[in-house]
Design a protein with these regions (language model features):
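Glycine-rich phosphate-binding loop signature in dinucleotide/nucleotide-binding domains
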Residues: 44-48, 129-136
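Short active-site segment of divalent metal-dependent hydrolases/proteases
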Residues: 12, 146-147
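Short aromatic-enriched loop/helix-cap "lid" or pocket-rim segments at secondary-structure transitions
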Residues: 16-19, 87-91, 153
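Domain-level recognition of soluble alpha/beta enzyme cores
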Residues: 155-175
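Generic beta-sheet signal
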Residues: 4, 136-144
Length: 175
């Protein structure tokens, strides 16, 4: 058994401007750095996290570094944990991306990827965890697509339901 905690990355300037970041490697904002070092750090004190995985995008990795500064917990970056590539809609208003998100489950965003491709990446990542991290508690710091992949593959929630709901940036899963 593996316990997986999920935490969304801290705030970025794109989040604050309500833009769809996708694969844009945007930095944390000042508020995001405070959020990671404060409330997000406190949330995981005393939980016995063995290993941390983040996407390879700065906003996720920097969130982990700030949350676990001074602690001796390994942090690994993995590109499979990236947000969806929104292609031409990257750094466009989130409303534009959300307007075509349902169509993008199986059809890629223009010059980007489909949400199913994100789910496939996440399935591959989850499958790799099982033989290598049995008995551990891991934390994944990622994005909406990362969480949807966990919810879809671990809990069996349909992607159509996940994308129509409100994004909650934490979760706990057992595999």
């Amino acid at each position: 058994m593996i316990t997986i905690y999920f935490e969304g990355h801290a705030l970025t300037s794109d989040n604050e401007a309500n833009l769809a970041s996708g694969h844009n490697d945007v930095d944390l904002s000042d508020g995001g750095r405070s959020q990671a070092a404060g409330e997000k750090r406190q949330r995981y004190e005393g939980l016995g996290i063995d290993t941390i995985f983040t996407s390879d995008l700065r906003r996720a990795y920097d969130t982990a570094k700030l949350m676990f500064e001074g602690r001796n917990i390994p942090i690994f970056q993995d590109a499979r944990l990236r947000e969806c590539d929104y292609g031409d809609l990257t750094q466009r208003p989130r409303t534009e991306m959300k307007a075509v998100r349902a169509e993008s489950i199986s059809n890629p965003f223009p010059n980007g990827e489909s949400l199913q491709q994100v789910m496939d990446r996440m399935k591959n990542f989850i499958d790799d965890l099982s033989p290598n991290y049995h008995g551990q508690s891991i934390l994944i710091i990622g994005h909406a697509g990362t969480l949807w992949g966990l919810e879809h593959h671990v809990n069996g929630i349909p992607l159509t339901k996940l994308i129509s709901g409100e994004f909650v940036d934490t979760g706990t899963f057992t595999i």
